[in-house]
């Protein structure tokens, strides 16, 4: 109904919950060609090998390609998995708009899908046994430390908070500094504080401002509005909230100092996820059988698995990103590392589906 793509290797007992694997097929603007696609094509390749070898699982295996994981169109990430797990409704997507003012509902419909059928696509409890996602690491640790495989012990939660500042537009040359109500000044001070707020909390939390919108965005006028999005992530839910609260406090402080109005709105969130011990043990066992150099590690990025964890036990496999680069054209993962990741995915899928 919304652009998620599925394929199934039918098992010998179709009454059993399915085992699912896959990732997303979209990217960010000016992004790379490995993020998401390694896990999507990796799942397809793992199932292709099963078919080639004549293996039929007991549990059916579903390959899934999730739509709109990055949030590039609507600044709402992981839409495909949110819709699959009932976290977004038809009414919600009628309200979500992109920069051109097109709603998610209309874009889905114009692409030939039926968004009104979304409720029928929501995964029913007990119908998915596990979701296993292969992904590039998107960080420098595996590449620098030399491990081929990361077996994920937990997935970071995320909050996106949208901060809007409203001032008074006026002439850049004729308006004295002491008479200005400049939202850009307030925004710059808030953004400068965010780095220190995150660093003071712990070593795992991260906070990023990667999107900013200024109106009217011309060089010879004081802006009347600034909107920016703060991306806060950590493997502990309570520290995410602490960071958000402190950002709200400095927003209020600098808005008042610069005599501008402000709003702070949470526009996206996902809970931190703990990977269940039994599935980690299966993956460790299979990694050792394959003689892979692996390490247990947390994931700092949010993935579709965060939302799939609402309906099933999830697990993730990471392969190294060269120089830690991701969401850039230079994004690259060595093909031998991808093969190792797909081998572990294949063995894990076989182990939990028989």
Regions found by a protein language model. Give the residues of each.
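Acidic/His- and Gly-rich active-site-bordering loop/insert found
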Residues: 1-32, 50
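Acidic, glycine-rich active-site loops and adjacent beta-strand->loop/helix elements
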Residues: 5, 25-27, 61-72, 138, ...
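Alpha-helical metal-binding/catalytic segments enriched in His/Glu/Asp
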Residues: 21-24, 30-70, 159-165, 171-197, ...
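Zn-dependent metallopeptidase/amidohydrolase metal-coordination segment
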Residues: 22-23, 293-344
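Flexible, glycine/charged-enriched surface loops at secondary-structure junctions
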Residues: 56-57, 118-122, 174, 196-209, ...
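Midchain, well-structured core segments that form catalytic/ion-binding scaffolds
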Residues: 68-69, 75-237
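Short beta-alpha connecting loops at secondary-structure transitions
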Residues: 91, 233-236, 267-269, 324-335
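A short beta-alpha structural unit
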Residues: 208-217, 229-235, 261-280, 306
């Amino acid at each position: 109904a919304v652009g998620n793509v599925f394929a199934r290797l039918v098992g010998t007992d179709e009454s059993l919950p399915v085992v699912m694997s896959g990732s997303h097929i979209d990217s960010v603007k000016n992004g790379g060609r490995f993020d998401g696609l390694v896990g999507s094509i990796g799942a397809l390749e793992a199932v292709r090998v099963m078919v080639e070898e004549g293996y039929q699982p007991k549990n059916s295996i579903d390959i899934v390609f999730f739509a709109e994981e990055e949030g590039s169109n609507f600044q709402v990430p992981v839409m495909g998995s949110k819709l699959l797990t009932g976290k977004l409704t038809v009414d919600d997507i009628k309200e979500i708009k992109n920069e051109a003012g097109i709603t998610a509902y209309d874009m889905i419909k114009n692409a030939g899908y039926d968004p009104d059928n979304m409720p029928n696509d929501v995964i029913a409890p007990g119908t998915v046994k596990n979701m296993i996602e292969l992904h590039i690491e998107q960080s420098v640790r595996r590449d620098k430390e030399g491990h081929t495989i990361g077996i994920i012990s937990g997935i970071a939660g995320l909050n996106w908070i949208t901060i809007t500042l409203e001032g008074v537009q006026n002439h850049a040359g004729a308006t004295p500094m002491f008479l200005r109500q400049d939202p850009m000044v307030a925004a710059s001070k808030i953004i400068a504080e965010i780095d220190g707020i995150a660093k003071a909390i712990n070593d795992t939390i991260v906070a990023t401002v990667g999107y900013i919108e200024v109106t009217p965005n011309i060089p010879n006028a004081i802006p009347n509005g600034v909107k920016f999005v703060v991306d806060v992530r950590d493997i502990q839910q309570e520290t995410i909230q602490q960071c958000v609260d402190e950002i709200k406090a400095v927003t209020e402080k600098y808005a008042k100092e610069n005599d501008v109005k402000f709003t702070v709105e949470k526009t996206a969130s996902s809970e931190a996820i703990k990977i269940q011990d039994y599935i980690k043990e299966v993956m460790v066992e299979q990694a050792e059988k394959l003689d892979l150099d692996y390490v247990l590690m947390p994931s700092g990025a949010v993935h579709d698995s965060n939302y799939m964890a609402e309906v099933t036990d999830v697990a993730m496999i990471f392969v190294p990103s060269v120089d830690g680069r991701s969401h850039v054209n230079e994004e690259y993962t060595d093909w031998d590392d991808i093969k190792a990741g797909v081998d572990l995915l294949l063995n894990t899928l076989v182990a939990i589906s028989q």
